[in-house]
Amino acid sequence: MAKEKFERSKPHVNVGTIGHVDHGKTTLTAALTTILAKKFGGAAKAYDQIDNAPEEKARGITINTSHVEYETETRHYAHVDCPGHADYVKNMITGAAQMDGAILVCSAADGPMPQTREHILLARQVGVPYIIVFMNKCDMVDDAELLELVEMEIRDLLSSYDFPGDDCPIVQGSALKALEGDAAYEEKIFELATALDSYIPTPERAVDKPFLLPIEDVFSISGRGTVVTGRVERGIIHVGDEIEIVGLKETQKTTCTGVEMFRKLLDEGQAGDNVGVLLRGTKREDVERGQVLAKPGTITPHTKFKAEVYVLSKEEGGRHTPFFANYRPQFYFRTTDVTGAVTLEKGVEMVMPGENVTITVELIAPIAMEEGLRFAIREGGRTVGAGVVSSVIA
């Protein structure tokens, strides 16, 4: 059979499983691919195909992640599942697999456990917008009242981290029974798929967002002016558009007088394109790598922010010793390093390699910044951590 063409007809949504170890995240992932494949087509994946997750690198950090896909009536889903707790932490902080929504798997037999709580907190910090709950192993609990108690406990936990606990869909089922072909439990997998379709809104495509291009290089072309190059992160730039140059210095306004790609002139460049943008009346020395071109008023420069960070362990090539308050590494945003001073949370004396922690950072130069922006923490070019901006302070 010929290879199927990737159908772009259905909207594409990124999801992932989160939750405590051994509550059934990988079994549920297998059940979703297997049971939805029967009805909507696609490849079924067995537990052991998902469990031996390959290594991948994101922002200098090695993460084990499994990627599977499945279809529903109306959508195509890309789903990530991680083998270990540390992989989840790294995945969510680096944004290696940006999630439009998460499926929180919680065993009905155990109820919420420490990692259940930690994953919900992480989802909140890194900006996962929606959580849907799958209460797993319900076949092991024969008391309906107990199921109700666990459900209430999960809703309270979600609400305590500012998710709408009362409105989150909660599906009670058993991933293992569904995989074994129990019709009633298979139905619960379809119920979960329907909840994904209806509760997670279709994400806005990158090309529909306001224009942003991180500047990688700057050239001056005699008789034409200054050209900056980079990959358009989102939106579209048209010839004649007003744009702002944001970060590192005072924000400057300019106009795009030309877009070129592969030495050809275009009318526009869009998300994903590597382009050169010609700027009217801008001097070569006014622009540098690390700034961004953006649609006016859509992004502002900041120096102080709160972040959720993962610090590499010694085995991962990170630091061998803890760091303390006033630690001053470089923060690598998009295309450049900026030095910053770290303040720790109240009651935190030090941060050990291998930990994830909330910090406040004050940079020595402003960077175009918004919540959800990812960065690497580096010491002399060596990556020692990764982080995500959870809130902008100043």
Swiss-Prot record:
Main location per the UniProt record: cytoplasm
TM spans (from-to): none
PANTHER family in alphabetical order: ELONGATION FACTOR TU, MITOCHONDRIAL, ELONGATION FACTOR TU-RELATED
Protein name: Elongation factor Tu
Region (G2): 60-64
NCBIfam families: EF-Tu (TIGR00485), PRK00049.1 (NF000766), PRK12735.1 (NF009372), PRK12736.1 (NF009373), small_GTP (TIGR00231)
HAMAP family according to UniProt: EF_Tu_B
Origin species: Neisseria gonorrhoeae (strain ATCC 700825 / FA 1090)
Disulfide bonds: none
Residues noted as binding Mg(2+) in the record, renumbered to the chain: 26
One GO CC term, this protein: cytosol
Domain tr-type G: 10-204
